[in-house]
UniProtKB/Swiss-Prot annotation:
UniProt entry keywords in alphabetical sequence: Amino-acid biosynthesis, Aromatic amino acid biosynthesis, Cytoplasm, Isomerase
Entry protein name: Chorismate mutase 2
Domain of life (superkingdom): Eukaryota
EC number annotated for this UniProt entry: 5.4.99.5
Organism: Petunia hybrida (Petunia)
Function: Mediates the conversion of chorismate to prephenate.
Length: 263
């Protein structure tokens, strides 16, 4: 969101529009990634290319990418959360003058470690073929773009939670004060009708964005580069549940007066 979209203009409609646009980004990046097989050598630790580095080639490329992006201010945005936050270089770009819209505890909520684990161990085997054909740098670039898009979508739960809290603070406050009532918070946050609409929409987008275009009018069936049902499953089993997890974590800390500033 642009600076002018924050604070008094923040609304569920504005956030919903952003989440819908983010669906496009995730699907297009997913289509790019599945052009390649898993290429498992990329993720093996330690990498044989860097004797003094204990991580994988993928981790090395990802950390270097985040370090460069940090220098130019990517992680000054409340919408962005690094996968490797330790020892990131300071930004040479001055921070935005936008007023803060989230509670300061938002900075402490980062589930990218969980997202990365799910991506490597569940999503890649689900979407990509089991082979190793090289092209490691290009494959990693696709991984990084897709992971950052998924992370942004999931951590947008902080904004969703903030707006819901502002709109219905009388409902959320007792549950937050109870602290342990995570199930009640999750129930209050869940709208099954909306989730079904999201699953259907992303499946339709995957079918449209990923269809193989042909000049033959009598083609018997449309071939898709990515299975629409798998994209729907991606949202159903991972993206939406993890987004709600972020919302719950944010709300449980929303009343922390010790860290509360003008919002």
């Amino acid at each position: 969101m642009a600076c002018g979209d924050y604070d008094d203009k923040l609304s569920l409609d504005l956030i919903r529009d952003s989440l819908i646009r983010q669906e496009d980004t995730i699907i297009f990046n997913l289509i790019e990634r599945i052009k390649f097989p898993i290429n498992s050598t990329l993720y093996k630790k330690p990498s044989s290319w860097f004797p003094d580095f204990t991580g994988s080639l993928f981790q090395y490329l990802f950390q270097e990418t985040e370090a460069l992006q940090s220098k130019v201010g990517r992680y000054l945005s409340p919408e962005e959360n690094p996968f490797f936050p330790d020892n990131l270089p300071a930004s040479i770009v001055p921070p935005s003058k936008c007023p803060p819209v989230l509670h300061p505890v938002a900075e402490s909520i980062n589930i990218n470690e969980k997202i990365l684990d799910v991506y490597l161990n569940q999503l890649l085997p689900l979407f990509c073929t089991e082979a190793d054909e090289g092209n490691y740098a290009t494959t990693a670039a696709c991984d990084i773009q897709l992971l950052q898009a998924i992370s942004r979508r999931i951590h947008y739960g902080k904004f969703v939670a903030e707006v819901k809290f502002r709109d219905c603070s009388d409902e959320y406050t007792p549950l937050i004060l109870a602290q342990q009532d995570r199930d009640a918070l999750m129930k209050l946050l869940t709208f099954e009708v909306v989730e079904e609409m999201v699953k259907k929409r992303v499946a339709k987008k995957a079918m449209i964005f990923g269809q193989e275009v042909t000049l033959v009018d009598n083609a018997k069936e449309v071939k898709c580069k990515v299975d629409p049902l798998l994209v729907s499953r991606l949202y159903d089993e991972w993206i939406m549940p993890l987004t709600k997890h972020v919302q719950v974590e944010y709300l449980l800390r929303r009343l922390d007066q010790n860290k509360l500033t003008s919002i």
